[in-house]
């Protein structure tokens, strides 16, 4: 079995190998991760642990890979993914978990001692074991839901039947209605259906409505024509020359408006010109000479800044050369010390090895033979091989009975050896294919004998090999090679990366230093570069401001030169006279437009009167048509009255049918209630049987737990007589759930488990854990500090009992103090 951990609690990356079907002790100092290994196996198989945080610190995810026989299991957290490969098939997530439960059992998933649980929690725990293959709770819920549905349906049916019975007292058979007479209908409508009669009525109503609408429209048009003639009399005659007068006035107004707009624009331009003239006087002190002087001052500051920067770079280069020389001397001294120290280590290892300086290949060969022999023996179970040899040898004997004395004998079919029939068991069989079976058994027996010889040879090799001494000597050989390699690497001095980079920088700047020293003397600076740059910034700002002022002055001079003469000679009196003349023309134009509106109104009314007269002529109104339609409508109403009586007669027939259907539905509801009541009684009986079956399964589980506890506790408590612990299932009345109570008989007294000592309590808890692990079918048994409170002798007896109880399972035990000899393998962290 191979376990690989990545970012799981205290393990960033680790791999552990465990032998199958054997017992492994995991020991080591506290905090080294012993319990984490068991937790990782539980996480890989079942995905649930009692720990909330399983991811390593400052990591975002973890991964556990478990290889067990044909299984390859990988479970990750963030993302939560389970992947299982078994016999060439791949399974994932829920499907993979089902496969793991089938082959590795289920886990109790309970971090609390069984006796510390409440009655409800104990029952839930035992129910999970008893009902592992079937969800009894879901079945009971379905039965309960079905009973609730039946009760609700019965209540609904009872209500319906009661309501129907009450309604039956009020619902009476309808009174008979005579069939209507068709002869009362007009002969032209007698053969028509109700829809046809209604269609005739709609057509008649539409025609009558059209005649009424035509009459109303004729009256409305007459009234509108009278109103128009009255308005024309009030407006009087129309003036046809008003249009020419309006055109003349509009031309005058347009000319005066253009003149007024031009004068207003000249006025605004005159105000802007005066403002620009006043602003121009502010730039009298700005000139080209002043700008040139500022430019020369900025160039002087630039030259001073360049000289200061070059001087600072030269000083910095001198400081770096001094630092490089000091670092070179320091690193050479450290290199000599490390070389001397490595030579001392090599001499010390040579002294420990002694005269045999070249025996490394022989030591490696002997260690390899030892570990190969140990691995071969751990992979083969010696008791199982012996038992198989005994069984094969027993199968080689065939029973023969003497026909004269009836004496039973056994004949070895391979060697023809004869022995008494009472010596040992008879496992041979007769029938077809016996010869082939005997050949296979002889061949298998030879293989087992060869395998036993190899195992005995390996035991002899392991006994004659001092593995600890050889391992220590092999480590010395390896340390010697490591030190020699380190000395070979340190033969030549290599400067550090920072020193090499500093020397490269100095070599790169040598040409710059020579050129700078030839032009500038290396003297202290009178003024810093920052101060010079601040002065330059101030001078540049003043230069930019002066350039902006000079540009603004030129712009104002150009703008003043482009103003027209009308702006220069603008007159306020001429502007006011033009506005007064425009106001007079606008008033006259408004009066003429009112006169034009009156003329248009007269023309519009005359056109409307002519249109109304045309509509009256087209209407062609005739009052006799309305009387004819009224007479036709009365005949149609008589026919519709006949059809109304027909509808009433049909309603009577429908009510009679409903009355008959009501009584039929009442009889059907009573029949359905009888059938549903029978189904309800059957379901109640089934629910009672489910509860009884569940109780019997719990009794069976408790009996199995008691039998396992009895066997374990007799070995865990050798000084106790009788059964130390027994679980009894007590039932309350039918409407409550059964409860579990535990009684402890220890040394002839009935006591509470909390009054036991720490060691006694640990043994009781271990017995419960092993019992549930065996019942749940766990393939890998994991025990974490289960004997921490027990002495060495009792711990040894308990571990021997555990090993004998689970001979064909992989057992992982975490313990600080235990006899390592009783375990097949020991893993020290």
Curated annotation (Swiss-Prot):
Disulfide bonds: none annotated. InterPro entries: P-loop_NTPase (IPR027417), RecF/RecN/SMC_N (IPR003395). It holds the Pfam family SMC_N. It comes from the Viruses. Belongs to the IIV-6 050L family. This is Uncharacterized protein 094L. It comes from Invertebrate iridescent virus 3.
